[in-house]
């Protein structure tokens, strides 16, 4: 279309380049895991810390952000780590800004939970709950029951201050889950996914399956789960290790997508190199997922899962001007690389 170009506009020569919406990373820890012993996204003092928020752990000056900008990632959903069974509240941030307040575009996005070896390893080694998968399920269910009771007492008080239960920020956050204002974002692999599905059904709460290695064993259960917001798969480059990491079935993305599940691909950065996200997406193409569908798993799908598709994830009038230019076609060409990243209409990286 011939559009009027204002005098102040920057003209970008993009002949031969591939333009697409800014990449949305649906599961990340950027800005919160620094060098050495810095674990600001893991409050490992209690097995359940629903009151804490990832927002307060993010260092806007972290070197993670220039790295992900160079990779074409314009928005990250930043979650607490998986040391605790209930890790805290999740937020979404743009990759550029002078402060976390300026960068954050949604808080909260979800409440982080974790199953399996991570919380078992943290607390079992201290001879504390949870030492087993039984214990993990008990921690989640008991906290949901407490929050349900708290909510019922609030409703019964009918606004009378003297009848209200003592204020509890953690329970308030879990009540957001029970009211289905936000989903739980669950670190889980293999049969731990079935625990997530059972608990979500029991309490009628929305959820995402994060990592989801081994999903190919449970297609029918996952695809029929009524409150599933999406599957956030990856990182796909993880080694085939014993136990939970033993089945990195990237081919499941084609089946889940074809059967109507909203799928996204994560970096888990900075734990895994965020620059590898496009290469990981290429693995999904190699193993059978159509290229156009894989690009959606990097853009509009994670935006939908985070409840941000009104702002990001596609190039449409009225949405944020988050655009990336690639030399080569990402997830299709091995040599494809990001050569320009635009966030909120401003070029923040150019090769």
Where does each model-flagged region fall?
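Active-site environment of divalent metal-dependent phosphoester hydrolases
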Residues: 30-33, 83-87, 191-194, 214-219, ...
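His/Asp/Glu-enriched, well-ordered alpha-helical/loop segment
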Residues: 35-36, 40-52, 228, 234-237, ...
């Amino acid at each position: 279309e011939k559009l009027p170009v204002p005098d102040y506009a920057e003209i970008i020569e993009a002949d031969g380049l591939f333009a697409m919406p800014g990449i949305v990373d649906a599961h990340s820890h950027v800005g919160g895991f620094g060098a050495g012993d810095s674990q600001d996204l893991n409050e490992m003092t209690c097995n359940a810390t629903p009151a804490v928020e990832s927002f307060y752990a993010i260092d806007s000056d972290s070197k993670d952000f220039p790295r992900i900008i160079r990779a074409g990632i314009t928005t990250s959903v930043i979650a607490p780590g998986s040391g605790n069974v209930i890790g805290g509240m999740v937020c979404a941030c743009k990759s550029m800004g002078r402060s976390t307040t300026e960068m954050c575009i949604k808080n909260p996005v979800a409440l982080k939970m974790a199953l399996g070896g991570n919380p078992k390893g943290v607390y079992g080694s201290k001879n504390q709950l949870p030492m087993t998968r039984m214990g993990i399920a008990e921690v989640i269910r008991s906290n949901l029951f407490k929050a349900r009771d708290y909510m019922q007492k609030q409703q019964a008080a009918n606004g009378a201050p003297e009848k209200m239960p003592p204020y509890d920020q953690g329970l308030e956050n879990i009540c957001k889950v029970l009211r289905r204002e936000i989903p739980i974002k669950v670190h889980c692999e293999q049969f731990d996914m079935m625990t997530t599905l059972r608990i979500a059904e029991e309490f009628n709460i929305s959820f995402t399956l994060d990592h989801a290695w081994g999903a190919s064993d449970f297609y029918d259960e996952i695809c029929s789960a009524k409150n599933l917001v999406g599957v956030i798969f990856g990182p796909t480059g993880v080694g085939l290790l014993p136990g939970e990491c033993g089945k990195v079935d990237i081919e499941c993305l084609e089946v889940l997508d074809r059967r109507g599940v909203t799928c996204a691909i994560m970096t888990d950065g900075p734990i895994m190199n965020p620059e590898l996200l496009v290469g990981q997406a290429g693995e999904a193409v190699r193993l059978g997922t159509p290229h156009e569908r894989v690009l959606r798993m990097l853009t509009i799908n994670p935006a939908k899962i985070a409840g941000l598709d009104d702002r990001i994830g596609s190039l449409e009038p009225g949405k944020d001007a988050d655009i990336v230019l690639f030399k080569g076609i990402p997830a299709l060409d091995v040599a494809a690389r990001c050569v320009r990243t635009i966030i909120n209409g401003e070029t923040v990286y150019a090769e």
